[in-house]
Swiss-Prot record:
This is Histidinol-phosphate aminotransferase 2. It catalyses: L-histidinol phosphate + 2-oxoglutarate = 3-(imidazol-4-yl)-2-oxopropyl phosphate + L-glutamate. It comes from the Bacteria. InterPro entries: Aminotrans_II_pyridoxalP_BS (IPR001917), Aminotransferase_I/II_large (IPR004839), HisP_aminotrans (IPR005861), HistidinolP_aminotransfase (IPR050106), PyrdxlP-dep_Trfase (IPR015424), PyrdxlP-dep_Trfase_major (IPR015421), PyrdxlP-dep_Trfase_small (IPR015422). Belongs to the class-II pyridoxal-phosphate-dependent aminotransferase family. Histidinol-phosphate aminotransferase subfamily.
């Protein structure tokens, strides 16, 4: 006799769909019999520069210790982060990617009968983390593709324990300013933990986008999450972190898996954090690449959503799925975002200049075919 194990799962889990990542290069190569080296992937917001040379050197040095468990407390990385982020060591929580931090929050603070509030067109992990623990996901309609913070505030009720906000937002790239953030934080009830997801904050230097760290001291119900997957180029190693009050950090560490960040990731993240030249190059490449894609969209008569991330959403003015498939046949992988409620858009990662040109030419060809 076999049971229906889908029906036996939590109701919230039954309603979820598995997370779908950007299509891997090898998968497309197998499907279309293409040379993997000929494929351009601009689908997963990865850093086109590759990893920092200093991070790669640190990984090589750490290889001899693979038989040993990593430092479960991540002391070296926490110390560097505490110094750079102007916090105490006991305010830092390390995660297996920043999505691990989001799940730790859900595991610690959400349960059946409670809810989390987040925006439409927001990161797919928010509903996954929320519903996986049996809590209710309260999705607030977006405003001009971004967070409607007053509406999100109005959605908070006595059963709300967490609000997820992202600045800049993924997948839209939209952002809000310091005054809007401060006004929001002032009015959020003290019993609600605000998770400020800053996965792309490094790309927004010099803009009007606020630094969440500037608000930590004033708001004990604020947690800032960040990652080494984007601007630091360590996506494969899965390392992120959260910054909060010591009390919140202590709670998260109670539900954190032992050794959740591996030794190679710890070593690489420490080295990457010190490589200011690499980070500056990443920012410069992203800025010029964004300008290149915007100019290309303008020539094609397409509109786009202004972005502060390392990606941009282009509006095709039609259902994007056939164009996405056409680009795949041209050996170019981007990201359809219909599952985010954006069926006419494609999200495109900023690549190297040649990759951006290849994408724009492929897009021109696919659109011309109709």
């Amino acid at each position: 006799m076999s049971g229906n194990f889908l029906a036996l799962a939590q109701p919230g889990v039954q309603q979820l769909s598995p997370y779908v990542p950007g299509k891997p290069v090898d998968e497309l190569a197998r499907e279309l019999d293409l040379d993997p080296a000929s494929i351009v992937k601009l689908a997963s917001n990865e850093n086109p520069l590759g990893a920092s040379p200093k991070a790669l050197a640190a990984i090589r040095e750490a290889l001899d210790e693979l038989t040993r468990y990593p430092d479960g407390n991540g002391f070296a990385l926490k110390s560097l982060l505490a110094e750079q982020c102007r916090v105490e060591l006991n305010q830092v929580t390390l995660g297996n990617g920043s999505n691990d931090i989001l799940e730790l929050v859900a595991r610690a603070y959400l349960a059946p009968g409670l809810n989390a509030v987040f925006s439409e067109h927001a990161f797919a992990v928010y509903p996954i983390a929320t519903q996986a623990v049996g809590a209710q996901a309260k999705v607030v309609p977006a405003k001009e593709w971004g967070h409607d913070l007053p509406a999100m505030l109005a959605a908070i009720d006595a059963n709300t324990r967490v609000v997820f906000i992202a600045n800049p937002n993924n997948p839209t790239g939209t952002w809000f300013g310091a005054e809007a953030l401060d006004d929001f934080l002032q009015d959020v009830p003290e019993h609600v933990l605000v998770v400020l997801d800053e996965a792309y904050i490094e790309y927004a230097e010099g803009s009007d986008l606020p630094d969440g760290l500037d608000f930590l001291a004033a708001y004990p119900n604020l947690l800032v999450s960040r990652t080494f997957s984007k601007a630091y180029g360590l996506a494969a190693l899965r390392v992120g972190y959260g910054l909060s009050t010591p009390v919140v950090a202590d709670v998260l560490n109670r539900v954190r898996q032992p050794f959740n960040v591996n030794s190679l990731a710890l070593a690489a993240a420490c080295a990457a954090l010190k490589d200011e030249e690499y980070l500056a190059q990443s920012r410069q490449l992203n800025e010029s690449g964004m300008q290149q894609l915007e100019a290309g969209f303008r020539e094609l008569g397409l509109s786009w959503i202004p972005s502060k991330g390392n990606f941009i959403c282009v509006d095709l003015g039609q259902v994007a799925a056939p164009v996405f498939q056409g680009l795949l046949r041209e050996g170019v992988i981007v990201r359809p975002v219909a599952n985010y409620g954006m069926p006419n858009h494609l999200r495109v990662t900023i690549g190297l200049p040649a990759e951006n040109s290849r994408f724009l030419e492929a897009l021109r060809k696919v659109l011309a075919r109709g």
